[in-house]
Each structure stands twice: as structure tokens, then as C-alpha cells.
A protein has these predicted regions:
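A short, N-terminal "cap"/entry segment at the start of jelly-roll beta-barrel domains
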Residues: 2-44, 88-91, 120-128
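A short beta-loop-beta micro-motif enriched in histidine and acidic residues
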Residues: 37-38, 50-65
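Extracytoplasmic
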Residues: 37-42, 61, 77, 93, ...
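Short acidic-glycine-tyrosine-enriched beta hairpin
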Residues: 47, 77-93
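Short beta-strand His + acidic residue motifs that chelate non-heme Fe in jelly-roll/DSBH
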Residues: 55, 73, 90, 96-103
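Glycine- and acidic-residue-biased ligand/ion/polar-headgroup-sensing regions
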Residues: 59-76, 84-86
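Ligand-binding loop in jelly-roll beta-barrel domains
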Residues: 94-118
Length: 128
């Protein structure tokens, strides 16, 4: 279950498959990592019922913590809980997202991305 949540969720934050940012995400802080060509981006994402996340990747790692949970619907139509208090990590260049928030609760996440500086935060997954 935790693996499925991690794969499907993280970045609930993308509105379009190749968007560089998301209408769901409010950036709180961005800083360069010392001695690297990477940066850390801390954000809050709020996804309202009916909002969807497209399949996407990040050029680095994304860690998230569910501040306020709800229910999500997977591409196959199955509805699963997305519970408050769960933490997960999406690894570099691993496709995730592709779900819809259902029910009456807005899902709220704290996200921390450690990504390659100068690359888009969100990108389309490569073709299979």
C-alpha cells in the first residue's frame, strides 16, 4: 500500500504532463545544495476534490508527508485512501501521479524536492 501511494502520489502537483510548475503547489523555500548542481525545493500542495494529477517525473528525489488525507481514484477506477500521516519518497525519473482526488476532502501535502538545478521540476516520462 505504501509503495502504491508513493508511486501514485508524489506529485500530485502537476497540472500538465510537461508543466514546469503546478497550480496545486505553493513554493515555500528554494535553496542550492552546497557543493553540487542541485537544489532543494520545499512546498505545500493542496489538491481539491475533482482535481487530477497527470503522470510525470522529477529530475531528482521527492519526499512528501500527507498533512490532510483524503481519497484518490486510480486510472483503473479503483478508489483508495490517501491517509493523513503517511510519508513516502519518489525516486529520480520514476513516473508517478495519474490519479484524481475524490470525495469531499482536499488533500494537503508537504513536499521536499532535491532536484537537478536548471531542469524543470516536472517533466513528461520518457516513452516506453
Amino acid at each position: 500500500m505504501k509503495l502504491a501511494l508513493g508511486i501514485l502520489v508524489a506529485s500530485l502537483f502537476t497540472f500538465a504532463a510537461n508543466a514546469q510548475d503546478s497550480p496545486f503547489r505553493k513554493e515555500l523555500k528554494r535553496a542550492d545544495l552546497t557543493g553540487t548542481n542541485m537544489e532543494v525545493i520545499t512546498s505545500i500542495a493542496e489538491i481539491k476534490p475533482g482535481d487530477t494529477s497527470t503522470l510525470h517525473i522529477h529530475h531528482g528525489e521527492e519526499s512528501f508527508y500527507i498533512l490532510e488525507g483524503g481519497t484518490i481514484e486510480l486510472p483503473d477506477g479503483k478508489q483508495v485512501p490517501f491517509p493523513t500521516g503517511v510519508a513516502a519518497v519518489n525516486i529520480r525519473d520514476t513516473p508517478h501521479g495519474a490519479f484524481k482526488v475524490v470525495g469531499d476532502k482536499t488533500v494537503k501535502l508537504l513536499t521536499v524536492h532535491v532536484v537537478d538545478k536548471g531542469k524543470p521540476l516536472y517533466d513528461k516520462p520518457p516513452p516506453k
